[in-house]
Curated annotation (Swiss-Prot):
The gene is TRAPPC13. Part of the multisubunit TRAPP (transport protein particle) complex. GO terms for cellular component: TRAPPIII protein complex. This is Trafficking protein particle complex subunit 13. InterPro entries: TRAPPC13, TRAPPC13_C, TRAPPC13_M, TRAPPC13_N. It comes from Bos taurus. Belongs to the TRAPPC13 family. Signal peptide: none annotated. The lineage of its organism: Eukaryota, Metazoa, Chordata, Craniata, Vertebrata.
């Protein structure tokens, strides 16, 4: 008959405690009217309570701090801090003590120990203390593995370890939307607007210290989250410094291509990586958290092989009087084009000039400007349409309708105004 040997007692004891900020002590005030049976008894008890504030005893919030009563929640972007203590509970001197702390995540194992050198000896009732820090960068299950090895006086080598399992939660819900800007000429530009919606999905308020956009190398960014009032920048969020649980805040940014890249149409056309958001917040007693998103990507606007944009156009024109517009034609392809311009009249818009004229060769990423004249025979808001560009090399025609809109008024109305 086999008998399992008794479990061997270790000479050292391992204790692990998470280090977090304390919280303000709260109490539940119990009061009554003076004419009630207890009289002033409850009020006197609150005045004698050391946890209450003098002169404001009925407030739940006190001046004293309390240590955390449980492990609490750990959120992505926060710093996980833990106190590790190895105590010699025996009456023997222990030698060659090595304490190792590893953090096991779903993808990697990290060594958090400040030193990997062994301690020569540890006398009775003495301890080895260590504090570890780690910025949490993954969500999901984490396991803190603390291993202790040592040698007894008899030369026997001992080893034991403990596991501490905890979950890392997501603190923020970040949603982004991209908008390709349109100029006042009703044409798509190279500017990109980014709207970031940030929601606090924790159970405590957050102070949003910084929400910035780090653009990619091809863009400059301008934050649109403040307004200028009397020479002073004021945030658009007003006096709301805190983001309450489940509340959402929207941030807006404008990205413009740098000059050296804006002049190269083919480069900007294929750019999908915009940049990444850097979010910094503070919670209980200034406990800091930081979160960086991955590289934000957008769908690149489809300009086709030839891009037509308007450089100048009047807002209001007179009925049956010529007006001028300036067009910019850009070759977004990787080949040279030989272009022919055709102008087709519509029911309300009539082009002035020669249709079918040669524009010449246009090299890749190159542009040319055209001054065109037209008139409208119908009042009201009219759409400028009817431009056709034909590449004689490939016999391919590009049609451009609804390029812009103009308001057409009669001459009499303009004279009277």
């Amino acid at each position: 008959m086999e008998v399992n040997p008794p479990k061997q007692e270790h000479l050292l004891a391992l204790k692990v405690m998470r280090l977090t900020k304390p919280t303000l002590f709260t109490n539940i005030p119990v009061t009554c009217e003076e004419k009630d049976l207890p009289g002033d008894l409850f009020n006197q008890l609150m005045r004698d309570d050391p946890s209450t504030v003098n002169g404001a005893e009925i407030l739940m919030l006190g001046e004293m701090l309390t240590l955390p009563q449980n492990f609490g929640n750990i959120f992505l972007g926060e710093t996980f801090s833990s106190y590790i203590s190895v105590h010699n509970d025996s009456n023997q001197v222990v030698k060659d003590i090595l304490v190792k702390a590893d953090l096991q995540t779903s993808s990697q194992r990290l060594n958090l120990s400040a030193s990997n050198a062994a301690v020569a000896e540890l006398k009775p009732d003495c301890c080895i203390d260590d504090v570890i820090h780690h910025e949490v960068k993954e969500i999901g299950t984490h396991i803190l593995v603390c291993a202790v090895s040592y040698t007894t006086q008899s030369g026997e080598k001992m080893y034991f370890r403990k596991f501490f399992k905890f979950q890392v939660l997501k603190p923020l819900d970040v949603k982004t939307k991209f908008y390709n800007a349109e100029s006042d000429l009703s044409s798509v530009t190279d500017e990109v607007f980014l709207e970031a919606q940030i929601q606090n999905i924790t159970t405590s308020p957050m102070f949003m210290e910084k929400v910035s956009l780090e653009p990619s190398i091809m863009y400059n960014v301008a934050e649109l989250n403040s307004v200028n009032q009397a020479g002073e920048c004021v945030t658009t969020f007003g006096s709301r410094a805190y983001l309450q649980p489940m509340d959402t805040r929207q941030y807006l940014y404008c990205l413009k291509p740098k000059k050296e890249f804006a002049e190269k149409a083919g480069i900007i056309k294929g750019v999908t990586v915009i940049g990444k958001l850097d979010i910094v917040w503070k919670t209980n007693l200034g406990e800091r958290g930081r979160l960086q998103t991955s590289q934000l990507q957008r769908m690149a606007p489809g300009y086709g092989d030839v891009r037509l944009s308007l450089e100048a156009i009047p807002d209001t024109v007179n009925l049956e009087e010529p007006f001028h517009i300036t067009c910019k034609i850009t070759n977004c392809s990787e080949r040279t084009m030989d272009l022919v311009l055709e102008m087709c009249n519509t029911n309300s818009i009539h082009w002035c000039g020669i249709s079918g004229r040669q524009l010449g060769k246009l090299h890749p990423s190159s542009s040319l400007c055209l001054a065109l004249t037209l008139l409208s025979s119908v009042q009201g808001l009219q759409s400028v349409s009817g431009l056709r560009l034909t590449d004689t090399f490939l016999k391919r025609t590009y049609e451009y309708d609804d390029i812009a809109q103009v308001c057409v008024v009669s001459s009499a109305i303009k004279v009277e105004s």
